[in-house]
């Protein structure tokens, strides 16, 4: 089952018979794992494709559905834009989620364009995720690394067949996060005292400012970019900003190479 979010709240199953804007029936079927392009040239287009996008920089994260038993799963993002929930016992997929912001990547990836010598590859959910117990919720919190500038918190269902929810989302357009760059930093869950009470918070770095890099290996000795040079602390339950610090100083580099 592949889900797409509708803002915060329970996610919606991607329906090949009623695809959302930006997708077609065959694109949804491809996301669902069908060999709609007959990659193996056997004339069958409704069989399993048995392939997923490359998890280039992200690493698997172990978690549990919190159903009272040892119901462990592995979560990993991939560069076709999907976050996968995988059964640790047999490797089967429980469900996958496509962030709405990455819908427009799907037809581009299907066309599989050639990559020129100075072209940066198209990335999806490329970062590492953190499992966090916040109140009664099990949350999966992560960014996009090379895929973009968002931070997501997914509320996990209590069973493998339950529906995941998008608990909260942070983007550079969110108030207080204008310095947020590409979200390379893996979020860290901790507790601090706020207003005399302990609070679960998530801390992450401001990320990378891609505007300061030249693709193709050109040297960049200094940057006046305004993105990424910040540290953020947010309420783990809501995503609301608790504290931040930023610097307007130069960031000196020896060399910036690309593509990665």
Which stretches of residues belong to each language-model region?
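A fold-level detector for beta-propeller and closely related beta-sheet-rich head/sensor domains
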Residues: 1-260
